[in-house]
Amino acid sequence: MTQLATGKATPHGATYDGHGVNFTLFSAHAERVELCVFDALGNEQRYDLPGRSGDVWHGYLADARPGLRYGYRVHGPWQPAQGHRFNPAKLLIDPCARRVEGELKDNPLLHGGYDEPDHRDNAAVALKCVVTADRYDWEDDAAPRTPWGNTVIYEAHVKGLTYLHPAIPSEIRGTWKALGHPVMIAYFKQLGITALELLPVAHFASEPRLQRLGLSNYWGYNPVAMFALHPAYACSPETALDEFRDAIKALHKAGIEVILDIVLNHSAELDLDGPLFSLRGIDNRSYYWIKEDGDYHNWTGCGNTLNLSHPGVVEFACECLRYWVETCHVDGFRFDLASVMGRTPAFRQDAPLFTAINNCPVLSSVKLIAEPWDIGEGGYQVGNFPPPFAEWNDHFRDAARRFWLQRNLPLGEFAGRFAGSSDVFKRHDRLPNASVNLITAHDGFTLRDCVCFNQKHNEANGEENRDGTNNNYSDNHGKEGLGGTLDLIERRRDSIHALLTTLLLSQGTPMLLAGDEHGHSQHGNNNAYCQDNALTWLDWQQANSGLTTFTAALIHLRQQIPALVGNRWWEENDGNVRWLNKNAEPLSAGEWENGPKQMQILLSDRFLIAINATLEVTDIVLPEGEWHAIPPFAGEDNPVITAVWQGPAHGLCVFQR
């Protein structure tokens, strides 16, 4: 191979042009950057990157081809107190690599050193990047662009969703191919969801602590390479990108959007005890928030925090997001611990990354969803994200659980959450879709576990049940665990029905956790991040088909109610909503605050949700008109009701006139 030509500062990463490969690497504080390429036997050849444009180092390797394995050695000061941890003995991966080979093992050779650098070379065990070529036929693929008002999100794990599906060929279960299989497409369509939100798909690693315990990071919130797909979800690592795009193309043909859960808040380099394999050795001071003593600000709980206010890191983040949209045609993102995106270090709505996203026509036109908190001071920012972000609404989650399971929430607060939490989100010209309503998510109890367990049971995680939240607002209905008498099972079923109805018929954007429509249980584990086993995999053969039918009917019903799909704030006397007591009269101030947990919600003047959240059977006088129950509440004998509905304890029904 020849020596490197100067090359260009863009595009980011390694780019094949048909004749050779252009390499770029951002580092504001490096003194020298070596490109290291490896042959099939692992022999290494090094080249200095000859070009530097601002803080971007670059070079062009003629005759290089896709499949070339490479990494970097970056030279500069080892000054931990100042935040500099350059160590050319350690091979580093390209932060913009499209494919990474190897597994990040718990190996002391991957550590960079503490007060002094570790001079042992680690190329033999280090991760390697692989040059790729982007050739793919999207055919007539088009983004569904489902309006927010019609959007119903389904949060799922690529492997857990399909790994036990008996109708999918065993050799592709748990992969992208399974995700796009006709059986899954048909299921999504039958259920009625419009968007599939996938837990992290970018290349991730298991933390050393988990490796030592014989566990693994199942969820994927420990990113190694943010542009590269996680190889375990591919049938073949060489074709991972095409397999992923095939799945997206199939989902798009069915009108289903794909939203990626993306982790921009930290990296798998963790704290100072963690490995040095990329950002830490490339430009630690720029990429991370550094304390005065050189340690990391740990606003993520993962050991480090990316500095998304630094211009170079902002550009890195935006380029990453654009890659997933432009190259993979994804339809949006859910941002993990998204308050980090707005830290300067204080949270600001005009933070550099927010401004860059808003000014980018590619990124500002896709769905953007924030998990609106981190664990640092001032990290809880629910309601404070700028447009066009929507946000996970934990107020809704807790209120729904408290109302139906704890029975200690006033009608007024329940109604406020049902109406889209305008007290939280009706600002800065935001619409009700800004509230992403959820009862459950990957993090926490499943819906079934909410009605079967009062306490978490996380012993399998190896932390003596200390991990996971204790604030579950759950109710086991008198017996801890699954199973029980017929009466117990029926009461739990009624609670599940009430929670699902609240979720799917409320103002805002509903998000359903995959498996909740099956009755999936994690046996009380509310932090199953390290359980890559039958505890988290959906068991399709044991799925509760009746509950699935109930859920699908609710989603279909939602799409028929103008007040829910219009994505407009409800105003008094606008015909969208009326709040009534059990006698079909407007609720009084006293009833809002201290009345019995009984009410009627009239939507679009035609759809009535009658609620009896008490423990007693109650007669509820319906408003004037001829009412009949509608699916999924209609039985075989569905007479017209003109006066009174006998509301069962802890029950509800939806009528239409």
From Swiss-Prot:
- State a single Gene Ontology molecular function: glycogen debranching enzyme activity
Q: Where is the active site?
A: 336 (nucleophile), 371 (proton donor)
Q: What does this protein do?
A: Removes maltotriose and maltotetraose chains that are attached by 1,6-alpha-linkage to the limit dextrin main chain, generating a debranched limit dextrin.
Q: For this UniProt record, give its keywords in alphabetical order, as a comma-separated list.
A: Carbohydrate metabolism, Glycogen metabolism, Glycosidase, Hydrolase
Record SMART domains: Aamy
Q: Which PANTHER family match?
A: GLYCOGEN DEBRANCHING ENZYME
The UniProt similarity line reads: Belongs to the glycosyl hydrolase 13 family.
Tell me, what is an example of a GO biological process annotation in this record? Answer: glycogen catabolic process
Q: Name one Pfam family in it.
A: Alpha-amylase
| Site feature: Transition state stabilizer | 443
Annotated region (Disordered) at 459-479
Q: Which reaction does it catalyse?
A: Hydrolysis of (1->6)-alpha-D-glucosidic linkages to branches with degrees of polymerization of three or four glucose residues in limit dextrin
Record-given protein name = Glycogen debranching enzyme
The EC number on file is 3.2.1.196
